[in-house]
Each structure stands twice: as C-alpha cells, then as structure tokens.
C-alpha cells in the first residue's frame, strides 16, 4: 500500500497517535497531528514528533475542508462525533483507526481478541502459548503496544496476537484476522456507544470481514455470542465451561478438553491452572481453542497453561499481611468484571470499589456484594452510586473514604486473618488517575509500605 505523499490528519496524540505519526513519516506521508491537549499537557513526546517535521495542531481540533486531507487516522480514545470526523465523512475522506492501518501492512496471521472482560489475560496467555511453541510472536494492540509500531517485522510464518477494543474496531474497514476471539458481551462503554446494540455492532467488526477459511472463537455460554454465531462468515469454534463442544474447547471431569480433529483430547486438569476464578477458566478455554485451531498440540498448550500466573492488575496477588491476602484487580473497570473478581474467592472479602462510572447500573454488582462482601469501602466520584445500590440490597457495612491511603488503612483495620482485601473498583480510574495501571500501582505501593511497617 502506497502512502507516499498522502496528506494524513492523525487525531489524538497518545501512544497510538504517536506510533501512527512515526509509521506514516517513514512511508513519506505528509502528516499533521492534532489533539485538544496543549504541548505542555502532552509532554516530551510531542517535541520528538515536531523534530521529525510533523505539523502540530494542538489545543483544539481543526476544521476539515474538502480535499484538504487524503485520510484521517483516529486514536481509539477519540469519539467519532468530533467535528473533523463529521466533516471528513461529509466530504468522503476515509476515516480509519490505527488497527486498520496496521492490518493493511500485516503479513503474519493475526489472532485478534475482544470481549467486555478478560481481553488482556487471554491475549497475554495466547501470545505465550505461541511463543512457547516456538513461533516468533507479536503481542500488541490495546494491551499497550500499538500494532503499527511492529507489524512489518513479522512475516507469514510468524504470529500476531492482538487485544482489540470496541473503540479500535469501530474504525476498521477491511480488518479480518485469521482467528477472531470474542470472550463475552456485557454492558460497557455505553457512555461512548450510546446503547448495547451499538456496542455489539462495534464488537462484531472483529469478524464481519472474515473469509470462510478464517475462524471465530466464541463463548457458547454467552447467549448473545451464541446468537452472533449465526451471522459469522467464518468457521465457528466454541468454548464452554458448561457444555460439551463438538468443535472447540470445554470442561469434562475437571479437565480442559479440545475437539474438532477427530475425538476429544485432554489438555490439562483445571486444578493445575494457576490463575484463579471461573472467568479465568473461560480465558484459558478461549486461548486453548485459538491455539488448537492454528495447530498447537494439547501437550504444548498444557505446558504453558500450567505455568501461566496471570498479568498485572487482574486479580494480582500483592501481599499476605497477618493472614490477610491483598489483591489488586484495578483492571476491574466495570461491574461485570468486579462481579467476576468477587466470584473468584470463597473467603470473606473487604472490597474497595468506586471511581468513574461508564453509565452502567450497579444493581447486579450490589447483589453480588451482599453475597460475597463483609465490608465495602467506597471512594471516587461515583462511589456513592455503589453505596446506594448496596444499601438498596440491604447491605449496610459501608465506609466511604476520600482517597486510597484511607481505603487501605481502613481495610487493614477491618480485615481478619483468612479474609481477602480486594481492590476491584467496578469503575474507570479517570476521576483520580490517568489509567487503571496508575491506580493499581498506588494500591500496591500502599499495601507493600504497610507490610514493611508491620514487619518492624
């Protein structure tokens, strides 16, 4: 694909936008980068882009006139309702995202993974499965490394494993991974998409351009995904915790099994997995199905599954202090993710929750709180909504606090040996932090400082 001399407006100066600028600069495009933030707010990265000769329009987005640009490339965090996008579409100027751009230069087969929850764990595990099997493997996408940064370094015999979000998928045009994986669908990002129907429509972009020789891996236990299977143009592979599957992965007699290439084959005992919770069992099943579909053996898969211990900020063990286990699940940015975290433990839980809600009801979360939580500590701009929902369920052991230092100290005072202190906010971090990672790192820092003080 020839981008020589193409006039491209890159919208959003985050990691994705910066990577796109550098990529297009190498292709000798004429690149303009715009962001509503100022040069000072963006920081040093913008200086480097300026030195490359990239035109900067900062502080506000520009108007787009007919014939002014050949293409707009969007960063995933930027809504498609902004003026330059509306104008570009009016003038038939193509609008695409970094994921679509990377795909157009991809040679290696892509395993793309989406879903409301579990994406990062499944993406990391799937990448590790292929690495351990000897493949040169790129793990990229919504997981922190823009695909466009590395995509040209991977060839036909290699593997690309990409975590893809609804924000990325809604700006695709031809994107068609060799294997598309959809883990689950529950309400999320409704503040951006407007409705559950639009959210599902965006997620479905992961498979709508696939060919009959491609594969889509779907959660059979998710009724919405089972229904979506009817509209997939590719070969459907299922995974399930609750049903025996003819073509895919499933549980039988506490064993992960695979089928579809002859009779069922055993992979590993579920008790040998080192990632806790039924949702992580689903993640393991999804990764297994994707890897098996592309030729990995049950033996190869079992070796990696038995070693994999999870990823940061997803039910991440932090410390055991005086018999109390502290767990960081800062990636639990919606109620469904937090519910899955609560379901992962049998011990009584001291739960720290709250942050910025994404327009989602906390009713089901509150029911699970009443069932699993002994003490609820709330904070953040919408912590009060969780408190109100819990009180409506008859749960009253609630302590609102102002910050994370107070939350951790209060949790220490309330927790008894054998209990779990769990940070699973059910909200985004954007009211108090730049990211869920920053939130999780602060929680870990506070817990480890407390552990150090307890040891004296």
Curated annotation (Swiss-Prot):
GO terms for cellular component: cytoplasm. Transmembrane segments: none annotated. Keywords: ATP-binding, Cell cycle, Cell division, Cell shape, Cell wall biogenesis/degradation, Cytoplasm, Ligase, Nucleotide-binding, Peptidoglycan synthesis. It is found in: Cytoplasm. It catalyses: UDP-N-acetyl-alpha-D-muramoyl-L-alanine + D-glutamate + ATP = UDP-N-acetyl-alpha-D-muramoyl-L-alanyl-D-glutamate + ADP + phosphate + H(+). One of its GO terms (molecular function) is ATP binding. Its main location: cytoplasm. GO terms for biological process: cell division; cell wall organization; peptidoglycan biosynthetic process; regulation of cell shape. ATP binds at residues 115-121. PANTHER family: UDP-N-ACETYLMURAMOYLALANINE--D-GLUTAMATE LIGASE. NCBIfam families: murD (TIGR01087). Belongs to the MurCDEF family. This is UDP-N-acetylmuramoylalanine--D-glutamate ligase. It comes from Desulforamulus reducens (strain ATCC BAA-1160 / DSM 100696 / MI-1).
